[in-house]
Amino acid sequence: MGVRKLKPVTNGTRHAILYDFSEITKKEPEKSLTEPLKKKAGRNNQGRITVRHKGGGHKRLYRIIDFKRDKWGVPAKVAAIEYDPNRSARIALLHYADGEKRYIIWPEGLKVGDTVVAGPDAEIKVGNALPLENIPVGTFIHNIELTPGKGGQLVRAAGMSAQILGRQGDYVQVRLPSGEIRLIHKKCMATVGTVGLAEHELIKLGKAGRARWLGIRPTVRGTAMNPVDHPHGGGEGKTFGKHPVSPWGQPTKGYKTRRGAKYSDKFIIKRRGK
């Protein structure tokens, strides 16, 4: 598991740092756990762009991931570690004792042949999933639920982990990767360990074409546009002479965009840093 730096044979390989895929043990996905993934190219049902810089890219199959970890008390053996084009992390294929197969996000240190289990009585071991009330203070966790039974929503990207800091009545204090300290209900599930592939932050694609293979389109500067397309557009020179804003006029570069009096404010003990 790691990265490889390409030799500067061409301009496209000069600065490229890519995965070596040494952690992958199985190339083809489990057919029963995949489904077609239709391309949206960042458009909604009206055909309008709702997410910029998306489009094209290689065809993908969606891998159905078990974010809920709701199969309590049934041990599962790690059968393979696979590539997933739909996320930065790798995924692990589990074979349960009753014959069922499921994918989970691959945590650092989990190997083929290891056994994992979910439930309140599970051991505090990498890959095991438990309610937050059963996980000791100081433990690093990932794939954290915000609502009991809804499935993990937080800390799912490569190399990420959160830490349990303490308990407060029916809630558990968790420090998230952003630095935010948040209260999460003690019945919410989380998986022990850190998401694998911490080297993801070292990756350099090296050329525009490699970004296009991933479905990432160019990011055009507002100052390079016409006035009809962006508040920074137009003019003879390079400067736009006003406070920087988004294409929709929202102030940017340090401006706080979270709306006030939000329901979840009472669960946030400390906001994330810059």
From Swiss-Prot:
| Alphabetical keyword list | Ribonucleoprotein, Ribosomal protein, RNA-binding, rRNA-binding
Q: Name one GO cellular component term.
A: large ribosomal subunit
- Ribosomal protein recorded as keyword: yes
Q: Which Gene3D superfamilies match?
A: 2.30.30.30, Nucleic acid-binding proteins, Ribosomal protein L2, domain 3
InterPro entries to which the protein is assigned, alphabetical: NA-bd_OB-fold (IPR012340), Rib_uL2_dom2 (IPR014722), Ribosomal_uL2 (IPR002171), Ribosomal_uL2_bac/org-type (IPR005880), Ribosomal_uL2_C (IPR022669), Ribosomal_uL2_CS (IPR022671), Ribosomal_uL2_dom3 (IPR014726), Ribosomal_uL2_RNA-bd_dom (IPR022666)
Q: Name one Pfam family in it.
A: Ribosomal_L2_C
Q: List every stretch annotated Disordered.
A: 224-259
SUPFAM superfamilies referenced in this protein's UniProt entry, alphabetically: Nucleic acid-binding proteins, Translation proteins SH3-like domain
Q: What is a biological process (GO) this protein takes part in?
A: cytoplasmic translation
Q: GO molecular function terms here?
A: rRNA binding; structural constituent of ribosome; transferase activity
- The protein's assembly and partners: Part of the 50S ribosomal subunit. Forms a bridge to the 30S subunit in the 70S ribosome.
Family note? Belongs to the universal ribosomal protein uL2 family.
Role played: One of the primary rRNA binding proteins. Required for association of the 30S and 50S subunits to form the 70S ribosome, for tRNA binding and peptide bond formation. It has been suggested to have peptidyltransferase activity; this is somewhat controversial. Makes several contacts with the 16S rRNA in the 70S ribosome.
Name listed for the protein in its UniProt record: Large ribosomal subunit protein uL2
Native organism is Persephonella marina (strain DSM 14350 / EX-H1)
Query: Taxonomic lineage of this organism?
Result: Bacteria, Pseudomonadati, Aquificota, Aquificia, Aquificales
